[in-house]
């Protein structure tokens, strides 16, 4: 938000859908392992398969620089561990939990802990933050629930990544530094109750690539990839294939490094926070309505802080919208941590180390990216927007300046929903330098009809920003000229070096009738499969 300065089988994605964007979302993203056990009416002792490994942002969503999605807190590879020396259930039937990551306390009520520490859960009714007793130290305090799992459960295994899509799996396994034989196990996207073994491979034809093997479950509880070799547990299956190729493309050698996820919220009960708890450290940028800072919360935690000029929006309206925004949890959305709700309003979010996508493309490492990386970034943005679409929400200001980048080309959508609250007369009149005319669908710019379909139009403009490395849309045209020409049917021509098939997707996004524009679900599917289904013969050029 701000001033504009000049393959497993997947079900078919729905290409078109009517707009119903006036519905307010009532549910949040539940995360990779299903709902919290408290929502399902379970006690901690019963919590063995549901949401005990990282939720919502796992394993993509680490704090930017150095903890970033696709990077990982632990850069060293870990050998496979099959047996845990400590039993999960001690006398009395109490389930013990084990820490999956290190955590440094952010408040006096938190517990610091190290990966492998064990806990007894005292109270898990809060969902995101549990009261626990450390078995290692005997101390009581709060811990982030997505940092622990029941001891000896599958969720506590290094190699188990839970509900991770095939595409995100390949992004992780193909990161630089991973070698042939790097692997993970995840839930199957297509078969309920089954798992997938995903493995990094190499051959002369494809180079580095990933293979995926379905792990099926027997009625007696066993597991197999092929029926001739069956195992009583997933742990035994993993152990076998680390010792024997036995039909796989390569032996399992190293576990794919996990990424420390974002906690859900900055701390327990830290939502409306005092201004004094924030320190503004480095100003990262400024726009018409405020500034963005790298800062520190409570002297312990690096965050991003957006400061809004007084009068930009009503504090009451902002707080109401922020309550919705904080429930929109997805690994391709920048999480909202906390707010200062009195003017000047402060918005506290995850810090993303590479800054905005626009700056990254124009002045950062993005200048040197080729089409495969740019299309992958676009597919990540479409993934986040498809979630916003499912939640019946609207962004209203989708453009490269409002996408943030972390290490390893991870993209997250920022500032969703804020544009609706701006009270500046020049902005609300949808004219002048403060309003992003060049990114806005004609029905929204002319008549104020903002829907998810106007977001689709904006996404088409964002695609041009990606392939031109941050060029301002409609070069050589002023805002009024853009409005007039677009209303008459003008559309930007295919950018230099851009494949015609990608330009055709842009043109689909720019259909005059909103309901004729594709859904974000369809756009995501198109982009994720682009180099297998649409442009399999792609060869790198000078620019793309």
From Swiss-Prot:
Its EC number is 2.7.10.2. Residues 92-153 form the SH3 domain. ATP binds at residues 284-292, 306. Residues 159-256 form the SH2 domain. Residues 278-531 form the Protein kinase domain. It catalyses: L-tyrosyl-[protein] + ATP = O-phospho-L-tyrosyl-[protein] + ADP + H(+). Keywords: ATP-binding, Kinase, Lipoprotein, Myristate, Nucleotide-binding, Phosphoprotein, SH2 domain, SH3 domain, Transferase, Tyrosine-protein kinase. The modification Phosphotyrosine is found at residue 427. The active site is at 397 (proton acceptor). InterPro entries: Kinase-like_dom_sf, Non-receptor_tyrosine_kinases, Prot_kinase_dom, Protein_kinase_ATP_BS, Ser-Thr/Tyr_kinase_cat_dom, SH2, SH2_dom_sf, SH3-like_dom_sf. The keyword Iron-sulfur does not apply. A lipid is attached at residue 2 (N-myristoyl glycine). The keyword rRNA-binding does not apply. One of its GO terms (molecular function) is non-membrane spanning protein tyrosine kinase activity. Belongs to the protein kinase superfamily. Tyr protein kinase family. SRC subfamily. This is Tyrosine-protein kinase Yes. The lineage of its organism: Eukaryota, Metazoa, Chordata, Craniata, Vertebrata.
